[in-house]
Amino acid sequence: MRIAILSRNENLYSTSRLKAAGEARGHQVDVIDTLHCDIDIASNNPKIRYMGEELPQYDAVIPRIGASITFYGTAVVRQFEMMGTFCINESVAISRSRDKLRSLQLLSRKGIGLPKTGFASRPDKIQDLIKNVGGAPLVIKLLEGTQGIGVVLAETNKAAESVIEAFMGLKANILVQEFIEEANGADIRCFVVGNKVIAAMKRQAGEGEFRSNLHRGGTAQLVKLTKEERATAINAAKIMGLNLCGVDILQSKNGPVVMEVNSSPGLEGIEKSTGKDVADMIFEFIEKNAKPNANRTRGKG
C-alpha cells in the first residue's frame, strides 16, 4: 500500500516510528509536511499539490496534526477525503476532539464520566462560576492549551478569582474544572485503535506538580485497566468519531472521568512504558480497513 503520514517533522519519534513500522510491513510510506500542501478545488477533480507537484493517489493517510495548525491541517485531511483516500482519523473528528468545550459537551450528552466543568464568557459573578464546580481547589484551563500549557491549579477561591480575572482580561477562553484530588497527580493514557484499547500507561506528575504530562517531567508505567476504565476509553473514542486516539482518564471517587481525547497521541511514552509495538498495530488496523471511499463520518455533533 502507498501511505502518507501528515507531519511537520519526519524526525519526531512518532513520525519516524510510524514510517519504519509501515516500511517493515512492506508499504511505501511518505512523510508529507502539512503546511507545504496546496489544495486545488475543482469540480469533480480534487487535488493536492506538494512542493509544486501533484500528489499521487494514496491508499491511506495518517494525520499527525499539531494543535497550532488545526484549521489548515484538517482542511488538508478533508481534501484527501474528497479524493477518496482512507484517513485513519477524519477531519471532522479531529476538529471535534480538538475543541475542548465541544468535546466535553458531546461526552456529557452520552453519560461519560467527567469532572464538573464550567464555562462562561463574562460571568456576572465569578464566585458563582467557582461555586458551581465545587469551589477551590480547582483547575483553570485555556481552551487552546496543549501538553499542560495554560493549566493552572488554584488552591483558594481568592486565587481562582484572580486567575480567572487575569485570563478574562486577556480575552482568553477558559474552562473551570473541579480538582480531582484523589487522583494524586496521576492519570491514565489509554491508546485506542479501532474499538480496542491496545495499550495503557499510568502517568505520575513530578514532585510539586499536578500535571502528569510527560512533557512536564512526569513518569509513566504500564497499567492494567479496569473494565470500567476500558469501556470509558472506547466509548469516548467512539463519541469523538476517532479510530486512533489517546484518552486521558483520572481515577475519581465516582469512577473514571475523562479529561481529554487526543487525536494525535504521541507514541514514545506509550511504547517505552508498555513495551508494545503500537506503530505496528496502527498499520495492522489500516491494512484491514483502508479501502477507497471507505471514510464514513463517525460520531455526532
From Swiss-Prot:
ATP binds at residues 141, 178-179, 187, 211-213. Pfam families: RimK, Rimk_N. Its EC number is 6.3.2.-. Mg(2+) 2 binds at residues 260, 262. Binds 2 magnesium or manganese ions per subunit. It comes from the Bacteria. One of its GO terms (biological process) is SOS response. Mg(2+) 1 binds at residues 248, 260. This is Probable alpha-L-glutamate ligase. It comes from Vibrio atlanticus (strain LGP32). The lineage of its organism: Bacteria, Pseudomonadati, Pseudomonadota, Gammaproteobacteria, Vibrionales. The gene is rimK.
